[in-house]
Amino acid sequence: NAYQYFPQGTIHLAVIDPGVGSKRRGVGIRFAGGYLVGPDNGLFSGILSQSPALSAVNLNNSSYWRTPNPSTTFHGRDIFAAVAAYLARGVPLEMLGEIIDPDSLQQLAIAVLQIEEDKIRGQIQYIDIFGNLITNIPDYLLEGKNWSVQLVPKIIPAKNTYSDVPSGEIVAFIGSHGGLEIAVNSGSAQKQLHLNIGDAIEVRIDRSQ
């Protein structure tokens, strides 16, 4: 979600690359917010699910690498960093390699929301170091509505922040990431609720008011 807070035209270089040195592609991607540079292994799936790729290239033009003989274990230095620097200098994306179909980019499976008239089903997609449960349910589905989280047998009412409930109590609110968050005031929601990444979360919408 952090990409949304960067200036328009930012070049985002990201390298989580267990397949470095294999046949996986390095890619440069143009999207509405700027550019993405990194391995084609699904790393950019979350961003592209919100802001689709406008164009993409396979970074196979070695003229724009740091060296034509890159390390088999350090493409972040020898390919991706160099390409990002050339983009920053104004080199067009299309000069950096072969144009590819954006639909061919590798995508990780991202949980699909189930939306009904009075309920939304999502899941936990991240747990931070404090034990807060970050879900994939976005704020715009909840804003202006009377909602609560159903964790049988618990019903967690919507609040604004941690301190809206006593210390040790569970609270649900729209977090700083822009989506539903479940937390415990001065505690860990993960430890108290025994939930993990991928576990289902159901929100009930009260339309009687």
PLM region descriptions:
Residues 134-194:
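A conserved acidic, glycine/proline-rich C-terminal tail/linker
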Residues 197-206:
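Surface-exposed interaction regions enriched in Ser/Thr/Asp/Glu
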